[in-house]
Amino acid sequence: MYACINLHFTDFCNFQCKHCFVNKENYELSFDELKQVVDKIYKYFNDNQINGRINLAGGEPLMSRNIGKLINYISSKDIEVSIITNGYYLTEQFLEKHKRQISIIGISVDSLEHQTNLEIGRCCKSNTLSKKQLLHICYKIKALGIKLKINTCLSKLNVNENFNDFINEVKPYRYKILQMHCDNENKINMVTATEAKIFLSKINYDYIYESAEEMKSSYIIIDSKGNISTDNLHSSKISIFDYELNDAINMLNINYQNYIKRYVLNE
């Protein structure tokens, strides 16, 4: 059996993406707390004979001073590690140091245009990652034998953009497109099913698409306070520090059909 736990251990981020679901309270689990979390995940995997992966996310995980220690600790348990990052702080030094510990690096690429990235909020002050910089990052990841994944959050701000040249150039092992879903003032930028269908019809590379509906209740997420939830709304108050992970997961209303489709059938 295969499973993936998404550990959104920090809220801190250098970008201000309008579609982001992360709390803006800027919490981050301490390293001692992270070790407790990893130990509970290890026990859950071991007790259930699961070949598991911990996916490190945020916020921006590479902003954490504990990221290296966290990767080392997870690896010491023989648990697979993956990271989702915006790429801004992804250095060659970091990649070289952890190339044998990280199986997958997912880069969030929502636009290749400077102005569009500014409108989305994918910027550090007024600085964005250029296509040239993204290409360099992607090539380095693949050269070190790490699987490259590209994520694109589809919104009205990028629905008319063509990513084909970029995707066919970097050739990720997985290209994932997610329909923007949020419940704040930025929901005006959510695309309709028809708009998404038109966008997808133009892609000439194998991709996986997840609608907002498919994402609901189909993840296992541990957030920056240690709360466990099944989607990106962080509505759960079930704390991993109060329960064994197996018991906590059983309390959640997980859509196992979509969970299995994402993590088992697509692995």
Region spans (language model):
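N-terminal [4Fe-4S]-dependent radical SAM core
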Residues: 1-6, 43-49, 217-219, 254-257, ...
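Conserved alpha-helical substructure of the radical SAM core
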Residues: 1-82, 90-96
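A cross-family glycoside hydrolase active-site/sugar-binding cleft signature
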Residues: 6-8, 55-57, 82-86, 106-110, ...
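Radical SAM enzyme [4Fe-4S]-AdoMet core and its adjacent flexible, acidic
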Residues: 29, 114-229, 233-251, 259-266
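Short, glycine/charged-enriched secondary-structure capping and boundary segments
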Residues: 69-72, 96-99, 120-122, 163-166
